[in-house]
Amino acid sequence: MIGRTHHCGQLSEEQVNERVQLKGWVQRRRDLGQVIFVDLRDRSGVVQLVFNSDISQEALETAEKVRNEYVLDVEGVVLKRDPSTVNDKIATGTIEVHVERLTILNKAKSLPFQIEANTDASEDIRLKYRYLDLRRPDMQETMKLRHQTTKLIRDFLDGQEFFEIETPMLTKSTPEGARDYLVPSRVHHGEFYALPQSPQIFKQLLMVSGFERYYQIVRCFRDEDLRADRQPEFTQIDIETSFMDKEDLLTMTENMMAKIMKEVKGLDVALPFPRMTYDDAMNRYGSDKPDTRFEMELIELSDIVKDSDFKVFSSAIKSGGIVKGLNLKGGAGSLSRKEIDGLAEFVKPYGAKGLAWLKVEEGELKGPIAKFFAGETGAELQQAMGAEDGDLLFFAADKKEVVFDSLGALRLKLGKDFNLIDESKFNFLWVVDFPLVEYDEEAKRFVALHHPFTSPKQEDLTKLETDPASVRADAYDLVLNGYELGGGSQRIYQRPVQEKMFAALGFTEEAAQKEFGFLLEAFEYGTPPHGGIALGLDRLVMLLAGRLNLRDTIAFPKTASASCLLTEAPGEVSLEQLLDLNLSIIGHKPDKVNV
């Protein structure tokens, strides 16, 4: 088959009077009787084709059979359009191709939805016909942006003398993390591989191996509950270094992100990125990934209201809880009582039992609980919250975790609902000094906040055995516009420290040896100090492209129930396949078994 001379979107007035050969899909066809216009599309863009009997009767007759999404091969001459027909909406709008030969390479059935940037098709239909959805120009642009971003990352890290090294997809299932996707072994009956949640252990072993600078753009798998910014399989920009100072690693990461922002978005970002401690982020924003594009911070009120007659507040404080507030500036006249009640329902899934509120009118507090805050306490409350006439004040009183979660979520909702967020901004932020561990009430033990290989801060190391809850991690998360782009840490690289960490997490010596003995042994062969970071490529592309969820940044994503509507995965397997694996499904005895 003869190739093409140009791509559709690359034609311009420079090619006027040139003979060209194009291939692509029919975006639109307009039949005016003696002349037919066809918009031909390929991944570069669209160009208008013209068919009439003066050019070629045969091509005109063939064009009469053409329909949307037919695949065409055409030859013709590029000519300038009549000034009255110039189309400023497309890059090729000043020219058209007068077609002398037309070959229909393939036909298309009636489409389930139109191949256009704006579609009213449901997401389920789009995912079922993903190969059509990916033809839409906005999806093509997103995939192109993803490619550009990936290439920039590779070029940048190559310039920093990093090696791209692959790590295994079939590995060992280990505790401390989300649920693994398990792969049964046919050779080793009753035993399973796990798909990697991250290459964490292997990249540390590569540091033991002496490679010093490693990266990988790697697929990872986690069997966890999904949401708009999560997928069961996702892509991670994985980086690990030996002998690199933490500050140098953070600076290098900032420079990489600045390069991406400049090349992809044309934006200059201020360096270095701001830093905020975990405690500061939680106290001010109710989140360890705060969106700093708008203000409205949480305000500490416990000392002011601890002796209040309003028992919801005073009782919470006496029980070891806290009281915090939010000030929606000018919000008093914007929300009805019904809408405020709706916000009280909104915070309940975050553990809040309710949402107290007050309005400020003519310098006085008004609302259901105003009688409890007359006089000096009310004045102190207004002063602390910077309250002015027309403001709407919200309050939460409970355990600090509940207050943080509920008011943090409410802050984001109000920011979006009242258009307080500057969507043109890209606000990067490092969050540092995380707790090393947190107590799991269900498991009745400490669990790692990040992972069990994170190093404690050196000044807290002596407390690891006696007071693990007070130990800070030498860890850092990179946040962009309220999303965690990724995180990293300095790693434990000495066996005694790693053993203490496992003990703090409730591992017996035997359990630690069984699960991680190979790593502990590696630490006895000259392991260098090392650290790294992992950034979510899907999430980064989502933010760069201005998409609303990760599915729009992945060519073939899964649904919220972790299924593929295109291939209908997960699907059935035969009884023979199960027998090969020495497996049976409890309660099922058909020829095909749904797994």
Curated annotation (Swiss-Prot):
Write out the annotated subcellular location: Cytoplasm
Going by the UniProt record, its keywords in alphabetical order are: Aminoacyl-tRNA synthetase, ATP-binding, Cytoplasm, Ligase, Nucleotide-binding, Protein biosynthesis
Source organism per entry reads Halalkalibacterium halodurans (strain ATCC BAA-125 / DSM 18197 / FERM 7344 / JCM 9153 / C-125) (Bacillus halodurans)
Q: Which GO terms describe its cellular component?
A: cytoplasm
The EC number on file is 6.1.1.12
In the UniProt record, the gene name given for this protein reads aspS
What is the protein name stated in its UniProt record?
Aspartate--tRNA ligase
GO BP annotation list = aspartyl-tRNA aminoacylation
Pfam families in alphabetical order: GAD (PF02938), tRNA-synt_2 (PF00152), tRNA_anti-codon (PF01336)
What does the UniProt record say this protein does? Catalyzes the attachment of L-aspartate to tRNA(Asp) in a two-step reaction: L-aspartate is first activated by ATP to form Asp-AMP and then transferred to the acceptor end of tRNA(Asp).
Checking PANTHER family in the record gives: ASPARTATE--TRNA LIGASE, MITOCHONDRIAL, ASPARTYL/LYSYL-TRNA SYNTHETASE
GO molecular function terms attached to this record: aspartate-tRNA ligase activity; ATP binding; catalytic activity, acting on a protein; nucleic acid binding; transferase activity
Q: Which InterPro entries match?
A: Aa-tRNA-synt_II (IPR004364), aa-tRNA-synth_II (IPR006195), aa-tRNA-synth_II/BPL/LPL (IPR045864), Asp-tRNA-ligase_1 (IPR004524), Asp-tRNA-ligase_1_N (IPR047089), Asp/Asn-tRNA-synth_IIb (IPR002312), AspRS_core (IPR047090), GAD-like_sf (IPR004115)
Q: Which residues bind L-aspartate?
A: 176, 222, 450, 491
For this chain, the family text in UniProt reads:
Belongs to the class-II aminoacyl-tRNA synthetase family. Type 1 subfamily.
Q: Where is this region: Aspartate?
A: 200-203
Entry-linked HAMAP family: Asp_tRNA_synth_type1
Q: Which amino acids does the record list as binding ATP?
A: 222-224, 231, 484, 536-539
Catalysed reactions, as listed in the record:
tRNA(Asp) + L-aspartate + ATP = L-aspartyl-tRNA(Asp) + AMP + diphosphate
How it assembles, according to the record, is: Homodimer.
EC supergroup of this enzyme = ligase
